[in-house]
């Protein structure tokens, strides 16, 4: 399928850029992705939200968070209001990695969007959002049908 094959090219390029950072700091791709996710989405700072938003497995997120804690890159804090609510925060030690990640993300965006007008960039974002929303809808329907059986 054309879209699927092309999407993998984009993902491969992003992973190439991020793999340099992973190698430099001794991180797995998942650990790096979690650090960048927490930086870019501070409102989604629980393990459950990382799983939900990133469509990752609970076990991979849990294992990666434990490793990030051991490397003193993140910290888990229990909510004062709700003992079951554990929030995850980036620590100062993660700042250098996140900065390198931001630079890689900027380079990625600059390179893959090269030659596009502002209007074309806007159109791409809108079309991609529609595609993702359609996929989300069908995933939701599929899960609902499975749960009904």
Language-model-detected regions and their locations in the chain:
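N-terminal leader segment of winged-helix/HTH proteins
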Residues: 1-25, 71-73
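Hydrophobic recognition helices of helix-based DNA-binding modules
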Residues: 14, 18, 98-101, 105, ...
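Short glycine/proline-centered loop/turn elements that form peptide/ligand docking sites
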Residues: 25-28, 60-63, 67, 117, ...
């Amino acid at each position: 399928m054309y879209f699927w094959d092309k999407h993998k090219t984009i993902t491969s390029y992003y992973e190439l850029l991020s793999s340099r950072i992973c190698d430099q700091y001794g991180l797995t791709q998942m650990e790096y992705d979690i650090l960048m996710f927490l930086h870019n989405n501070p409102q989604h700072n629980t393990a459950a939200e990382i799983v939900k938003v990133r469509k990752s497995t609970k076990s991979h997120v849990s294992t990666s968070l434990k490793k990030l804690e051991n490397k003193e890159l993140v910290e888990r804090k229990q909510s004062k209001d709700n003992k079951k609510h554990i929030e995850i925060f980036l620590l100062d030690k993660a700042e250098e990695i996140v900065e390198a990640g931001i630079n890689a993300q900027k380079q990625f965006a600059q390179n893959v969007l090269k030659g596009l007008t502002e209007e074309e960039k806007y159109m791409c974002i809108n079309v991609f959002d529609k595609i993702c929303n359609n996929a989300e809808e069908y995933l939701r329907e599929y899960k609902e049908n499975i749960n009904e059986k």
